[in-house]
Amino acid sequence: MSQRSTKMGDTIAAIATASGAAGIGIIRISGSQIKTIATGLGMTTLRPRYAHYTRFLDVDDQVIDDGLAIWFPAPHSFTGEDVLELQGHGSPLLLRQLLTRCLDLGARQARPGEFSERAFLNGKLDLIQAEAIADMIGAADLRAARAARRSLDGVFSRRCEALAQQLVRLRIHVEATIDFADESLDTLDRAQIRTSLQTLNVELTQLLRDAEHGKRLCDGLYTVLVGPPNVGKSSLLNALIGSDRAIVTDVPGTTRDTLRESVHFHGLEFVLVDTAGLRGEGDAIEREGMRRTLNELQRADLALVVLDACDPQIGSLALADALTSVPRVLWIHNKLDLLTEPPSVLDTDVIPVSAMTGAGLDTLKTRLRTLLLGETVETIEGEFSARLRHVQALQRTAAHVTDANAQFSYEHLELTAEELRLAYKALGEINGSMSPDELLGRIFSNFCIGK
């Protein structure tokens, strides 16, 4: 039995609303001691899913607060256990006093994310849906919130489950032929397995692409500004975010550390990272800044290579090498206002701008939006939220399917079946069916207390 099983009989409680004073505050309780706690608070009768107005009493029958109590009996509750929600005034002092009373009556303080964890362990949610709750709460824009809503509704889960069933059927088919190893694989069986492998690969590739898109929607496009010193990277960052966040001087090498700012263009989130200019000289601190610049490029979704429009030279072999591993690169010719003649730019990946006057910034923002969403936005209704671990698990799944295809080409049926088993295992990590306890602990520990 899993160490994280909820079959331990304990009852958990936590404040479920945000910290600070508010009109309403909620305490959520889940577990087998609900009726004992309700009685201790002064409630004698509770009807399922009915809002009871009541007074919440302390050990001396003094009123802590008054409000509504709602009982959700198991298994028809969020966690799958008996759940009691207490809705009172949003005073932090009163909420803490009421929570303490619940703990005195037999509950314990819930861990971060423990309510969602219990919902997962009791089969009320899969892991994708549990994570979608946190993604919806933390969404920085409406589109990301709607994508998280679709994951909570099961859009991502159903696609993963469909692929898992295909993997199972295909593995059964392959293993059935192993019993006849002394016979050559007939043409019909060979064609069916080959077609199934190809179909699986196509659908996995599409799901991986959609998951990468979902991750960008939730996390924002991680966009790193790089280039030689004194080309206006910090000025461009300030212009894009609309404030003087980065220090700007005429002295090359002013920026020596990375600076991150989240910004929204067209309702979409971007994480902009200003970095130290790359050149072959500088003191120890500046060299450390350049090292950090190269490290940032390793995690970048997009690199904005900022060059001086008057002399657009990259000037760094290290930067040129690092850019080869970045998924998307956009070239920015800054200081457009200093040109005596209009720029003759033919490359669509080059955008002339002026951080000083704002010329070209709207074009840049529109291009950034296109890079995040793709060339079309016709897939809005199918969008779902995703995380880095989902993308990585799909990548491992796809790699095993590719290896299965290769092994099948050599009629290595045992190895083909094994690769399909490993693909199924990797895919199962996404919805939690194959996730170890340690991974579950890390995931739920990042949730809010009370969720």
From Swiss-Prot:
Write out the residues that bind (6S)-5-formyl-5,6,7,8-tetrahydrofolate.
28, 85, 124, 451
- S-S bridge residues: none
Q: Which residues bind Mg(2+)?
A: 234, 255
User: Which cofactors, if any, are listed as required?
Assistant: K(+)
Q: Which residues cross the membrane?
A: none
Classification via Gene3D superfamilies: P-loop containing nucleotide triphosphate hydrolases (3.40.50.300), Probable tRNA modification gtpase trme, domain 1 (3.30.1360.120), tRNA modification GTPase MnmE domain 2 (1.20.120.430)
Cofactor binding remark: Binds 1 potassium ion per subunit.
Q: Name one GO biological process term.
A: tRNA wobble uridine modification
Q: How does it assemble?
A: Homodimer. Heterotetramer of two MnmE and two MnmG subunits.
Biological role: Exhibits a very high intrinsic GTPase hydrolysis rate. Involved in the addition of a carboxymethylaminomethyl (cmnm) group at the wobble position (U34) of certain tRNAs, forming tRNA-cmnm(5)s(2)U34.
Q: What is this protein called?
A: tRNA modification GTPase MnmE
Organism of origin? Xylella fastidiosa (strain Temecula1 / ATCC 700964)
